[in-house]
From Swiss-Prot:
GO terms for molecular function: agmatinase activity; formimidoylglutamase activity; manganese ion binding. GO terms for biological process: L-histidine catabolic process to glutamate and formamide; L-histidine catabolic process to glutamate and formate; putrescine biosynthetic process from arginine, via agmatine. InterPro entries: HutG, Ureohydrolase, Ureohydrolase_dom_sf. Pathway: Amino-acid degradation; L-histidine degradation into L-glutamate; L-glutamate from N-formimidoyl-L-glutamate (hydrolase route): step 1/1. It catalyses: N-formimidoyl-L-glutamate + H2O = formamide + L-glutamate. PROSITE patterns: ARGINASE_2. This is Formimidoylglutamase. It comes from Staphylococcus aureus (strain MRSA252).
């Protein structure tokens, strides 16, 4: 079920009503009905769409609450300064789960997300469970029907479980099994968060991955080269971040809190190797769970990541 954006989420400190250099995002955001959006001749600005769904998390036996993530992130983002002076910033609202099967919600989200990708230079998709990634893939493939898609996931988990239905832990297996014209790179894998069968599947499918232990102090030249090579090998890049990759000291409000997770600045450094590429079609950020957040710490962290990602 799709609902348009809520203007009352977008509030903040008012420094000026006339000087754009003093504006914050809540002063520049607009709201549109994405279901009625016509294709523009030239992509411009930024589109934001929320995936207010945690059904996939529940099916994956995780902590529910991530369906409240998109609105919490938007509220935190609203008060940040508009340093980039975005040509357009549109909140398209959220998609909610009201179908019998999760896959139907993912398809509904994909149809809408594809419209944002076509119309904007940057599209941010805010979760919600990491089943958002499969919906993001469907949207990407809709926009780019024949191109090779490189999926880059900053995550503690492979999320390549074999299940009978779509969950927050199956997205990337679904992608790889359904589409031979895709590749998968995972940055931040937790050795204690993945079974041997998942490592075996990664070997079988030639999944590139980097352990969290390799990213604790800095991003090495070898890893930078791996990222650049992966981007070069694909026509389109689908970029996604699962917030459970970040140590719970910094990101307590997630579906599965990380032990020995990454530092936020490491995630930011990794993302800055990816975001500048013109091949990036969209960015999703998943598993922000306000139920377990402390002082809005995780919501603010996601908001600031998006703020840094703006071109």
């Amino acid at each position: 079920m799709y609902k348009q954006g809520e203007p009352n989420l977008w509030t903040g400190r008012l420094d000026s009503e006339t000087d754009p250099k003093k504006f914050r995002h809540f002063q520049t955001v607009t709201f549109e009905d994405l279901s009625k959006l016509e294709k523009s001749s030239t992509p411009s600005g930024v589109g934001i769409l929320g995936y207010a769904v945690d059904k996939g998390v529940a099916l994956n036996k995780g902590r529910i609450g991530a369906k409240e993530g998109p609105d919490a992130i938007k509220q935190a983002f609203a008060g940040l300064p508009d340093l980039n002076q975005c040509e357009t910033l549109v909140d398209y609202g959220n998609v909610y789960h009201d179908h019998e099967e999760l896959i139907d919600t993912q398809k509904e989200f994909a149809t809408l997300a594809a419209k944002s990708i076509v119309n904007h230079r940057q599209t941010f998709l805010l979760g919600g469970g990491h089943d958002i990634a499969y919906a993001q893939y469907l949207a990407t493939r809709k926009v780019y029907p024949t191109q090779s898609i490189g999926v880059i996931n900053i995550d503690a988990h492979f999320d390549t479980r074999a299940e009978q239905q779509s969950t927050s832990g199956t997205s990337f297996r679904q992608i790889l099994e359904e589409d031979e014209n895709t590749g998968y790179l995972v940055l931040g894998i937790a050795q204690g968060g993945n079974t041997q069968s998942l490592f075996d599947y990664a070997k079988e499918k030639k999944i590139d991955y980097v352990f969290a232990d390799e990213l604790l102090s800095h991003v090495s030249p070898t890893i930078k080269d791996m990222i650049e090579r992966f981007i070069h090998e694909h026509d389109v890049i689908m970029f996604t971040i699962c917030m459970d990759v970040i140590d719970s000291a910094f990101a307590p409000g997630v579906s599965a809190p990380a032990v020995l997770g990454l530092y936020p600045h490491t995630v930011l450094e990794l993302a800055k190797r990816i975001i500048p590429s013109d091949k990036v079609s969209s960015v999703s950020i998943a598993e922000m769970n306000p139920t377990y957040d402390a002082d809005n710490r995780t919501a603010k962290l996601v908001a600031n990541l998006v703020h840094h990602f703006l071109k």
